[in-house]
């Protein structure tokens, strides 16, 4: 994958437009989770150190296109950046017809989704973005799977289009895990439905040596193996699909599970052997014996890809399976990559972020890359690098 990299460019005196993913949760005008902003800071600092005039853009939320909405304004992000960088970061609402920026300046553009034509990737808007800069830097892996004006169109028309350090690191890490993984490779794919992760499961079945499944996905695989799953969430119409996937790759199944009679924070958890699951039981986690077996398997792996908690970890009584596997990944010498919103929440809960080799910032983009799909915003950077 050959793309121009921002780190290799001379940016002194250049106008640089950086597309970041600053789509963070905001409540009462305050940023609630700053992970994406923190991830973007090194790129912004580097551009300033290189002597550029820096303009940063992003989307936030899902406003009606072409209309300003206060709740989707990047104002709280501008305030956060000002504190983090120790300098005022002005938020510019009117920028499409040109802005005055000089070397050492840093400005944040208002939500790109307030601009008509952003989501449709309209040429007219993309050309306006491109006219603002000498160099366009795509650094938002989380939106790389969307061909929009500020992620794809601008890269077509800008004089120079490059990948930022964050995007480059994501592509390197995913390439290492999926392109030529050190073996044995284990993948953990968990979630409520096989249907939403079907392409991920099929793709990984052709790459990894062991495919650990969790959540509702595991229940469908258990049913495919002839086990009773009680009133657990599972997809009867995908039992044959689960069998086909299990025929391609080793899918170790739980030998014991944690069940409850209801899905609630106050639900009483009971550990049962898989053969003892009753008709009115809901499987809400893997059991301790299974967790120990899966942990041993992870400890011997050289590459681990993790997407999704294996139980309802938000309720502590159904979180032990996820905690055990999270710690096994953290303790492993393997190259480990984790991605997906719930996965990141589990990593935070168990305090293991420093011990995962790479944590992906992109949810949908992470999954689409794993599925083997082309990410439009990356593809255009490759095309531009070829000249």
Curated annotation (Swiss-Prot):
Positions annotated to bind ATP: 197, 314, 340-343
Signal peptide: none
Known catalytic reactions: (2R)-3-phosphoglycerate + ATP = (2R)-3-phospho-glyceroyl phosphate + ADP
Gene3D superfamilies from the UniProt entry: Phosphoglycerate kinase, N-terminal domain (3.40.50.1260)
Cell compartments where the protein resides: Cytoplasm
Residues the record lists as binding substrate: 21-23, 36, 59-62, 113, 146
GO MF entries: ADP binding; ATP binding; phosphoglycerate kinase activity
Pathway: Carbohydrate degradation; glycolysis; pyruvate from D-glyceraldehyde 3-phosphate: step 2/5
Biological process, per Gene Ontology: gluconeogenesis; glycolytic process
Keywords assigned: ATP-binding, Cytoplasm, Glycolysis, Kinase, Nucleotide-binding, Transferase
UniProt xrefs under InterPro entries: Phosphoglycerate_kinase, Phosphoglycerate_kinase_CS, Phosphoglycerate_kinase_N, Phosphoglycerate_kinase_sf
HAMAP family to which the protein is assigned, alphabetical: Phosphoglyc_kinase
Subunit structure: Monomer.
Family label: Belongs to the phosphoglycerate kinase family.
Protein known as: Phosphoglycerate kinase
Protein species of origin: Pseudomonas paraeruginosa (strain DSM 24068 / PA7)
């Amino acid at each position: 994958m050959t793309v121009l990299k921002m780190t290799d460019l001379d940016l002194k005196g250049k106008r640089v437009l950086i597309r970041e993913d600053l789509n963070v949760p905001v409540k009462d005008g305050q940023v609630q989770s700053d992970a994406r902003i923190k991830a973007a800071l090194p790129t912004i600092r580097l551009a300033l150190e290189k002597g550029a005039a820096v303009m940063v853009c992003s989307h936030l939320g899902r406003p009606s296109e072409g209309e300003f909405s206060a709740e989707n304004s990047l104002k709280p992000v501008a305030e956060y950046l000002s504190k983090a960088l120790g300098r005022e970061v002005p938020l510019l609402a009117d920028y499409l017809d040109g802005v005055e920026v000089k070397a050492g300046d840093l400005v944040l553009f208002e939500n790109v989704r307030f601009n008509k034509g952003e989501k449709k990737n309209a040429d007219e808007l993309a050309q306006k973005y491109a006219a603002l800069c000498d160099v366009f830097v795509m650094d938002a892996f989380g939106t790389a799977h969307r061909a929009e004006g500020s992620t794809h169109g601008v890269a077509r028309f800008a004089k120079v289009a490059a990948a930022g350090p964050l995007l480059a690191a994501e592509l390197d890490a995913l390439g290492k895990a999926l392109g030529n993984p050190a073996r044995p490779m284990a993948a953990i794919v968990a979630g409520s439905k096989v249907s939403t992760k079907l392409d991920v499961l099929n793709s990984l079945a052709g790459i990894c040596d062991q495919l650990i499944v969790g959540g509702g996905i595991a229940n469908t695989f258990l049913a495919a193996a002839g086990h009773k799953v009680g009133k657990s969430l599972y997809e009867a119409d995908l039992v044959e699909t689960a069998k086909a996937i299990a025929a391609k790759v080793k899918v170790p199944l739980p030998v014991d599970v944690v069940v409850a009679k209801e899905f609630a924070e106050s639900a009483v958890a009971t550990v049962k052997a898989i053969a003892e699951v009753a008709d009115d039981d809901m499987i809400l986690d893997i059991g301790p014996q299974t967790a120990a077996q899966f942990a041993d398997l992870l400890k011997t792996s050289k590459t681990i890809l993790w997407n999704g908690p294996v139980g309802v970890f938000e309720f502590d009584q159904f979180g032990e399976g996820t905690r055990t596997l999270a710690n096994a990944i953290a303790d492993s010498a393997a190259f480990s990559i984790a991605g997906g919103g719930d996965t990141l929440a589990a990593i935070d809960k168990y305090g293991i972020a420093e011990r995962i080799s790479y944590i992906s910032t992109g949810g949908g983009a992470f999954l689409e890359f794993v599925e083997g799909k082309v990410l439009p915003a990356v593809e255009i950077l490759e095309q531009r690098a070829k000249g």
